[in-house]
Amino acid sequence: MGNVVQERQGALAQGEVLPRPAASQSEGFKQGRSVLNSLVSGAFAGAVAKTAVAPLDRTKIIFQVSSNRFSAKEAYRLIYRTYLKDGFFSLWRGNSATMVRVIPYAAIQFCAHEQYKGILGKYYGFQGKALPPVPRLLAGSLAGTTAAIITYPLDMVRARMAVTPKEMYSNIMDVFVRISREEGLKTLYRGFTPTILGVVPYAGLSFFTYETLKKTHAEKTGRAHPFPYERLVFGACAGLIGQSASYPLDVVRRRMQTAGVTGHTYSTVLGTMREIVAEEGIVRGLYKGLSMNWVKGPIAVGISFMTFDLTQILLRKFQLL
């Protein structure tokens, strides 16, 4: 026994790294696999959801960045004219840029949410259980903020591609290069402040609503796992509440992002808000396109949450085989 202890001490003195205990290795492997599952599930969820509503999203952005009055009839006319002029797939123009941004954004957001839930659960003594309301709201806000900070330039590029003719920019890299060269690198973060101000309530309320509805459902029905259509409905409610709360800041963000190609000189959040209200009014300016968002948003968020949950469940089942 004494010889074994001396051998281990001698090995440590020579700088040799002793093997980690099997339990510690297993725990680290499980944690890494959990993070990977969240990243993959989040990326897939974001891609499916955004592709499903891409034509509506593009139409909404075009109205947001112009002073033209919005109506469902005008939105339909714009979609139809685009289809006649440029073809069916032109309705998905800018979707490649959307995917470049949405896949990492959704992956980071969903993964960060799982991590923040664990951290806050441990801090508040609710590890492995549903979080209380305030930490539940905080976890969502932190997750959205983390994802927005990391992926914001991609959102800027996506907005530019959505509102410009296809002849103006040939591909995503062309947008990056030309914005950097012609307008400066700082332009890639134009509109960042209203984005963060909007993400905090949007992500917080979206995740909070979805998690709360799942918790209430489990308590009322005794089923820990809702059916897919129930997850879709919970996600749709979450999207409706989250997007309605943050919508004016979304309009401000789009105006600031596309200022370089629309002829305006929006520079600050308050200045942009004042100009929009002065020219178009509060409802027709800051809430332009909200009715379309009430269609698009719940569908996208519902699909996103449902896809994330079901993909995670599927991945866990495969790992048990």
UniProtKB/Swiss-Prot annotation:
InterPro entries for this protein: GDC-like, Mit_carrier, Mitochondrial_sb/sol_carrier, Mt_carrier_dom_sf
A Gene Ontology BP annotation from the UniProt entry: mitochondrial membrane organization
Gene Ontology MF term list: ADP phosphatase activity; ADP transmembrane transporter activity; AMP transmembrane transporter activity; ATP transmembrane transporter activity; coenzyme A transmembrane transporter activity
Coiled coil: none
Signal peptide start-end: none
Superkingdom of the source species: Eukaryota
Main localization of the protein described in the UniProt heading: mitochondrion
Solcar repeats (start-end): 33-119, 131-216, 226-314
Loss of function: phenotype: Morphant embryos show morphological anomalies including dorsal curvature and bent tails, severe muscle disorganization, early motor defects, and mitochondrial abnormalities.
Claim: Iron-sulfur is one of the keywords in the record: no
Function comment: Mitochondrial carrier mediating the transport of coenzyme A (CoA) in mitochondria in exchange for intramitochondrial (deoxy)adenine nucleotides and adenosine 3',5'-diphosphate.
Protein name: Mitochondrial coenzyme A transporter SLC25A42
Species: Danio rerio (Zebrafish)
Upper taxonomic lineage: Eukaryota, Metazoa, Chordata, Craniata, Vertebrata
